[in-house]
Curated annotation (Swiss-Prot):
Topological relation to the membrane, as annotated: Multi-pass membrane protein
Organism name: Rattus norvegicus
Descriptive protein name: V-type proton ATPase 16 kDa proteolipid subunit c
Principal location listed in the UniProt entry: membrane
Any Pfam family: ATP-synt_C
Gene3D superfamilies: lithium bound rotor ring of v- atpase
Subcellular location: Cytoplasmic vesicle, Clathrin-coated vesicle membrane; Cytoplasmic vesicle, Secretory vesicle, Synaptic vesicle membrane
InterPro entries: ATPase_proteolipid_c-like_dom, ATPase_proteolipid_csu, ATPase_proteolipid_su_C_euk, F/V-ATP_Csub_sf
GO cellular component labels: clathrin-coated vesicle membrane; membrane; proton-transporting V-type ATPase complex; synaptic vesicle; synaptic vesicle membrane; vacuolar proton-transporting V-type ATPase, V0 domain
Protein role: Proton-conducting pore forming subunit of the V0 complex of vacuolar(H+)-ATPase (V-ATPase), a multisubunit enzyme composed of a peripheral complex (V1) that hydrolyzes ATP and a membrane integral complex (V0) that translocates protons. V-ATPase is responsible for acidifying and maintaining the pH of intracellular compartments and in some cell types, is targeted to the plasma membrane, where it is responsible for acidifying the extracellular environment.
Stretches in topological domain Lumenal: 1-10, 77-92, 153-155
UniProt modification remark: Ubiquitinated by RNF182, leading to its degradation via the ubiquitin-proteasome pathway.
Similarity comment: Belongs to the V-ATPase proteolipid subunit family.
Length: 155
């Protein structure tokens, strides 16, 4: 009876949802960041095509957010078993939501800052360093979620 209480049939569902949410939410954030900063690069490159390669940094940083989600999703998926406990699957759900939602927020921040920063850098090149610093702070938001997710998934 105690085994059914700790290991119900539906317990693996929460682990799968953790892996799915890690990938889905972080990919949504990365996609938004890529699209938003990419449109800024496209608009800026009409007037200053020589700055395209220098302005690609926000797109790269947005893509890294999806890698965070992929790492956690793979870790969770590899640790799923038939007899997983409810406690362990809730930890996996928490890990997936942690990296996924922080990746979503970081992607939004990177997209908005990248768009405005690229357009501003085209007009005033001294803004480049400030844009990079703000992008680093936005990227760290996703990194915090990755750290919490790794702690939760390895517990």
């Amino acid at each position: 009876m105690a085994d059914i209480k700790n290991n119900p049939e539906y317990s693996s569902f929460f682990g799968v949802m953790g892996a799915s949410s890690a990938m889905v939410f972080s990919a949504m954030g990365a996609a938004y960041g890529t699209a938003k900063s990419g449109t800024g690069i496209a608009a800026m490159s009409v007037m200053r095509p020589e700055l395209i390669m220098k302005s690609i940094i926000p797109v790269v940083m947005a893509g890294i957010i999806a890698i965070y989600g992929l790492v956690v999703a793979v870790l969770i998926a590899n640790s799923l078993t038939d007899g997983i406990t409810l406690y362990r699957s809730f930890l996996q759900l928490g890990a997936g939501l942690s990296v996924g939602l922080s990746g979503l927020a970081a992607g939004f921040a990177i997209g908005i800052v990248g768009d405005a920063g690229v357009r501003g850098t085209a007009q005033q090149p001294r803004l480049f360093v400030g844009m990079i610093l703000i992008l680093i702070f936005a990227e760290v938001l996703g990194l915090y979620g990755l750290i919490v997710a790794l702690i939760l998934s390895t517990k």
